[in-house]
Amino acid sequence: MRIEIFSDVICPWCFIGKRRFETAISRLQARGIDIQVDYSFKPFQLDPTASSSETTYAKDAYAKKFGGEQRAAEILQHVTNVAAQDNIEFNMDVALRANTFTAHRLLAFALINHGSATQILLKERLMRAYFTDGQNIADTAVLVSCAVETGIDETVARQFLESDELVTEVQYEIAQATEYGVTAVPTFIINGQWSVPGAQDVEMFERILERMHANS
């Protein structure tokens, strides 16, 4: 089963959806179901106008988008509580607004050169850098550090990030989301045909995956 997940590093529901999706796979395998899921991440930018060089707090961007600090605080507290139920720590008071295009380039590089397992690890690490550690994921040093933690050579990662390699390819993949009808993330594209939008609960992911496995 092949699944492509359109997702953004700064999307809280993408982190939650990733965790629930992976939990569903683990549960199915624990039940003795021989399900093999080849999944990887595709780029989507929720905030393409964010600066790549200047940092502001993400909570300020939420306040501007949702009509004030109080409403933003309510939204961020809600998603923090939901994340905690899936054993994810959000520290939204320190999260920094950042342009994610370069992070998406690095994720594409990881997939092409190191495979989906490394890309999945890198995706997790980048999201933790943003949501938990309050790091600027548009910063080259942060991106290199995350890459190294997932087994990518430091010099190779830095040279890649300082180049324009995969810029055109990632731009194309972002545009490809429109072709699939993706308007929000996360969106899970199964075998290039079926679309599952949103951070479904674990039980729903289990049912979907089990049904697809039975029909394969």
Model-assigned labels for residue ranges:
Residues 19-130:
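Structural alpha/beta surface segment adjacent to cysteine/selenocysteine redox centers
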Residues 3-6, 10, 16-33, 37, ...:
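C-terminal cap of thioredoxin/glutaredoxin-like
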